[in-house]
Amino acid sequence: MNVLKKALVLGAVGAMLAIPGYAKVVTGSQSDANLDLKYPLVYTDHAYAQQAINTDIANYVLEAKDMYYNQHIYKVAQNYKVTYEDSQVVSILLTTYHYYAGAVHGMTNTRGLVYNKITGQRVPLYNYVKIVNAEQLDRGLRSYVLDYYTGSHTKSRIPQGWSVKYVTDNYCLRGKGNIDLVYQPYELGPYSNGTTYIGFTPQSIEYFNRMNS
């Protein structure tokens, strides 16, 4: 572990030791003139899991700092949202924004991070739903078995001329048995649609698992 990563992880762990036991996710932050990073620090009752989760998150924070300090991208920001949490798992959407000087617009990259709070390991999508190919997802959207959401998580329809090109393993939990697959801008719609999501309900999850068993 390099010095920067070690300092970041130790700082995160140290901050969490000071918070009360009822806190589950708190916000860490770092800033500079055109750098504004806000990222999750996850607290669990299992020290090893806590360190593993926050070390993994630290990698994404370090990526953002590398974009700013080493790649000299004009502006970099990061924020997050906890989409679901229970005693076993925590689901987080971590979004990194970057803007090159002179570009028409900035770009975002959103990662769904679903962690087992007991082991500290990432939980793979196939633990919840089995998907064979992109055609299944595309057909599911067009038959309304699956839902299409824009960046504000507003239900819509996949735009004309766009289709699902690949099966992503990028996902988040939404609670009540719902799961969203996460696609970046321009992957399932124009830039104005932002980050887009393919939504699975418990009913569509059962259907896909039965179909692909």
Can you say where each PLM-predicted feature lies in the sequence?
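Bacterial N-terminal signal peptides that target proteins for export
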Residues: 1-8
